[in-house]
Amino acid sequence: MGNFKLTSSAFEDGGEIPRECGYKNGNEEPPLTISGIPEETASLALIMDDPDAMGAVGKVWVHWVVWNIIRDQDMLPNDDITPLYDSKITADVRCGMTDFDDTGYGGPAPPDKRHTYVFKLYALDSMLDLSKESTKADVEKAMEGHIIEQATLTGTYAP
C-alpha cells in the first residue's frame, strides 16, 4: 500500500489546470496517469469535484464521475504508469451525471474566483453495478466496503 498515485502530465499536484481543460475554454479532459495500482484491484473509479463551489453555489460541484475502469493486464503490463483513457479500456467504463446535467467530463468553471479541484481515484475490489445516469452519491454509496486504496490529485483554475 502507499504507491497508488494519480498524476497529470499537464499540471503538478496543486498546480494550475491548463486553460483548455476549462468548461468554457475547450473542455478537454486533462491527461491523467495512474501508477501503483494495488494487485487485488478489480476496477477503478474517478470523481472530480469542486469543494470551493460551496461558497458560490451552495454545494460541492461535481465535474466528472467515472467507474468500472478495468484493470487489464494488457493495458497495465507491469503496474507501471498508464494513461487513464487508453484505447484498450473496455466498454465497461461508465460516466455518470455531473452538475452540468450531462455525463462525461465537465471542466473547471469557477463563477467567482480561483477554485481548487479535487480528482479522487479509487481502487476497488469489485465492479460497480450502476446505470449511466448514476450520480456521485450513487457511486460513493456503491463503493462503500469496496475501496482498497485512494489516490488524490488537486489542481486550481481561475475564471
Predicted regions and their residues:
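N-terminus-centered regions that define maturation/targeting leaders and the start
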Residues: 1-159
